[in-house]
């Protein structure tokens, strides 16, 4: 059985891309009730539903999404581990509660990178908090805040959204 179904080559891209995450949006598990994919590109999501609450966290320049390919020739399997590392300065009682709720659940997470692309991590299985810290720092210049590691495992890499989160049916909920 042949599994090689490549459809495109790849040219060397321009050097106009930057690293980093601008925002992440947490969505309660199963709130994305009507996921639809682009008819011409089934790796791209057109819609996540109607008026889906997306809780925005601003994580400029201090967070990353890494997708590790877990492939085994012996088992005939391939999966994609999605690891989201977040750093959020400043402790607050409101954030304490939300961090606790994120840790108890397994939300879907939309990642907006610094290039304006949106990815849906934990699309089917959600993302689990697998570690993190609530830290006051030691010296005056140290971070006082939260770090979180969320991990998910999916059959495919985190899908792109075809456009913005609001165009895909998300309702942005911002904090104070």
Model-found features: residue ranges?
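Oligomerization/assembly interface segments of phage tail-like spikes and tubes
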Residues: 72-93, 142-156
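Short, acidic/charged, Gly/Pro-enriched secondary-structure junctions
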Residues: 99-121
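N-terminal alpha-helical "arm" segments
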Residues: 1-22, 171-176
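Solvent-exposed edge beta-strands and adjacent loop segments
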Residues: 10-83, 127-140
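A general structural signal for short secondary-structure junctions and capping/turn motifs
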Residues: 75-76, 99-101, 111, 138-142
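Charged, amphipathic alpha-helical segments
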Residues: 2-10, 79-100
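Mixed-charge, glycine-accented linear interaction segment located at domain edges/termini
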Residues: 126-176
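Short, hydrophobic/proline-enriched secondary-structure or compact coil segments at domain edges
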Residues: 21-29, 84-89, 105-113
């Amino acid at each position: 059985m042949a599994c090689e179904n490549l459809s495109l080559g790849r040219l060397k891209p321009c050097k106009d891309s930057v690293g980093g995450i601008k925002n992440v949006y947490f969505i309660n598990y199963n709130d994305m009730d009507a996921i639809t994919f682009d008819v011409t590109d089934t790796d791209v999501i057109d819609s996540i539903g109607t008026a889906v609450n997306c809780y925005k966290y601003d994580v400029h320049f201090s967070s990353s999404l890494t997708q590790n390919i877990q492939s085994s020739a012996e088992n005939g399997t391939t999966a994609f581990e999605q690891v989201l590392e977040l750093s959020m300065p400043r402790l607050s009682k409101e954030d304490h509660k939300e961090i606790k709720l994120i840790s108890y659940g397994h939300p879907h997470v939309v990642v907006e990178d610094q290039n304006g692309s949106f990815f849906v991590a934990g699309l089917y299985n959600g993302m689990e908090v697998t570690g993190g810290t609530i830290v006051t720092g030691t010296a005056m210049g140290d971070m006082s805040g939260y770090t979180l590691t969320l991990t998910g495992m999916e059959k495919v890499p985190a899908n792109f959204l075809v456009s913005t989160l609001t165009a895909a049916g998300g309702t942005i909920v911002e904090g104070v």
